[in-house]
A protein has these predicted regions:
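General beta-strand structural signal in soluble alpha/beta enzymes
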Residues: 22, 80-82, 106-107, 138-141, ...
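Short gly/pro/ser/thr-enriched loop/turn and capping motifs at secondary-structure boundaries
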Residues: 113-114, 145-148, 232-233
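Loop/turn elements at helix/coil->beta-strand transitions in domains of secreted/extracellular proteins
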Residues: 47-48, 77, 101-103, 134-135, ...
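Glycine/threonine-rich flexible loop motifs
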Residues: 112-122
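Catalytic-core regions built around general acid/base machinery
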Residues: 97-101, 121-135
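Catalytic nucleophile loop
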Residues: 107-109, 128-152
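Portal/gating segments that form or line small-molecule/metal binding sites
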Residues: 51, 57-101, 107
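C-terminal and late-domain segments of enzyme folds
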Residues: 2-46, 52, 58-73, 152-154, ...
């Protein structure tokens, strides 16, 4: 289940809660791919140890191998892979010990229900929380991003208008406690279901992540956007709704929701729910040496994204190209 590219078991010298990077899936499509490079930077670069958790995907072993190759090319000193597929495997003490040496954790896409149901409440799940608390960066892409929060978007329908029973919430991994995360946001028209969840739980902040776009959330609750798309933030603190009266799958009345759409470089204070003045400084270009690995990763990320697509949201072109299995992302 666990493997690594180098030896060593000493816990890294970190302090304080680490950053959390949530990615909207299909990351780094453009030539200057900055999201994974930023993750590597936050994980410590040459001095870092990244653990790739690929439980969410049925392509897990292949995904682990490609991410390992990419992260090594980007300069990480050590990359390990974990892919428990049962709760017994996730309770293996060896998995927890490996996680205890990580400076960065990267959870792949696929099916967030698989990830949360296998890892949540196990030794590996506890080790993941410990890693975050001692300063490791925790990242998830697509399904891995949704699973990061305590309240997880398990599955739901597409559409711009909020409707009753449009989305299902279940328990996630508990790293972020005050948000609910949705991914492939613009590409799969998921505004409606995020609005419906926030209207029913207005204490939560809704975060909708476009593809090839990430939000980095730091310990001080500052959120920074990177990538080519946007992060949609839904603040329900002043919301008015009839969601408790709506029946069936009928449209809900939602008024007073505060929406922010932030492209790369902008920052947001999740504590005060306000935009911070001035965009953040962009990270530099990624070396050309990783181009081949990134192209291979991009092809695989599209397969993983397709694997996790809601069956009723699949694009017509994708339907013609291949038969897609059901998943809950």
């Amino acid at each position: 289940m666990a493997n690594s590219t180098s030896s060593g078991s000493r816990a890294p010298a970190l302090s304080g809660a680490g950053p959390v990077m949530i990615i909207g899936g299909a990351e780094d499509k453009l030539r200057d791919r900055v999201i994974l490079a930023r993750f590597v930077q936050l994980a410590g670069g040459r001095d870092g140890h990244v653990v790739v958790v690929s439980t969410a995907s049925s392509l897990g072993d292949e995904a682990t191998g490609l991410y390992r190759e990419l992260f090594l090319h980007l300069g990480v000193g050590r990359v390990s892979g974990l892919r428990p597929v049962t709760r017994d495997e996730a309770n293996d003490p060896a998995a927890g010990r490996l996680m205890d040496t990580a400076t960065g954790v990267f959870m792949t896409g696929g099916n967030q229900l698989r990830l949360a149901s296998v890892v949540g409440g196990t030794e590996l799940g506890a080790a993941l929380l410990r890693a975050h608390e001692r300063g490791a960066v925790i990242a998830g892409t697509s399904a891995g991003a949704s699973a990061v929060s305590t309240h997880m978007m398990a599955f739901g329908a597409s559409g711009a208008s909020p409707k009753h029973r449009m989305a299902q919430i279940s328990a996630g991994l508990g790293i972020l406690t005050n948000v609910v995360v949705d991914q492939h946001f613009e590409q799969r028209t998921r505004l409606g279901r995020l609005l419906s969840v926030v209207s029913q739980s207005p204490s939560l902040i809704g975060l909708g992540l476009d593809e090839d776009t990430a939000a980095v959330i730091f310990a001080n609750q500052t959120l920074e956007v990177i990538g080519r798309g946007a992060v949609t933030i839904v603040d329900g603190s002043e919301i008015v709704t009839d969601s408790y009266q709506t029946k069936g799958h009928r449209p809900m009345m939602v008024s007073g929701a505060i929406l922010h759409s932030l492209p790369g470089g902008y920052r947001f204070d999740l504590k005060s729910r306000t935009l911070l003045a001035g965009p953040a400084e962009a990270i530099g270009k990624v070396p050309r040496a990783v181009e081949t690995a990134r192209r291979r990763l991009h092809r695989l990320s599209r397969e993983i994204a397709a694997e996790g697509a809601d069956s009723f949201v699949v694009d017509r072109k994708d339907r013609k190209a291949r038969e897609l299995p059901e998943a809950s992302e």
